[in-house]
Amino acid sequence: MTEHETRRRFIGATGALMIAALAGCTGDGDDEGGSDGMDNESMDDEGGSDGMDDGSMDDESMDDESMDDKSMEHGATTFTVRIENVSSTDFYGADTATGGQIWITPGAYAVHTGENPLYTEGEAASVGMEALAEAGPPTGFDGEPGLVDELDGAMQVVSSGAYTPANTVADPNDPMEAVPGAPPIAPGGAFEFDIEAEPEQRLSFASMFVPSNDLFLSPDAEGIALFDDGTPVEGDVTGSVVLLDAGTEPNGQPGVGPDQAPAQDAPDQGADEGGVVRRLEAVDDGFEYPAVDATVQVTLTPQ
């Protein structure tokens, strides 16, 4: 599946300020004939009885059938993924670049096996992740590959794409260039997009946290489980999401620093930090940030 085969929708907040095969054992009809000889032989050789043998065989067959049915009960499932900005409208001061709000930019997603393919804690961010974390666009800086490009064809990535305004209808009051490359969602806004996945596959995504120099929201290293013992997961999965520092620019005071989206004059204008991706909780920059579950809510709805 490519990004062009995946439906994405943007749900703007009403009144929100937006500055930006069935498988199983069927049997073969041997229950009625020829079984006496097998049972008698079993009795002679093993000292068992017809009832015990039949029961054991039936129980084992039923167990096998149940396991087969359970493992094959769900094939590919379509999920609607909703990423909602649940932050307060005045977390930062009204005189900050976002008017006190926290914004979440459009981003890139991947359905994958194995670990989250968008980043690795303790390693340098990719070129595409740097662009997203510093300025918001999942399509990258001009002339450089974006995160969407990096995910396309990557090992263990089953499908990938971007949830961007190019495929949506944005709020008419939303300034389209609030974050270079793509507008963000303000408190109360949400993105929705559909993915298709099979058991053992997981979901990861990344969106920039605004205002910041290079912070982003993404699931942890494992990604978000889409199935629980073969059953599609439904409901709130925000507990798998973390706030990370890309390590590409030094952090400034949120909403005040001149090298941050949306205040910066151009993307990638801040100094290079040369660091590695870390959870924000491990970065002692002295600034205040909201808890993840007070910033974003991520839900899954299987179709």
Regions found by a protein language model. Name each.
Residues 210, 219-232:
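Extracytoplasmic/secretory-pathway segments with low complexity and glycosylation-like composition
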Residues 189-193:
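Short strand-edge motifs at loop-to-beta-strand transitions and within beta-strands
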Residues 198-212:
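Short, surface-exposed ligand- or partner-binding patches at beta-edge/loop junctions that are enriched
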Residues 1-80, 84-91, 95-176, 180, ...:
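Terminal disorder- and signal-encoded targeting elements
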Residues 184-185:
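Short proline/glycine- and polar residue-rich coil/turn motifs
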Residues 196-201, 227-231:
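A short, structured loop/turn motif at beta-sheet edges
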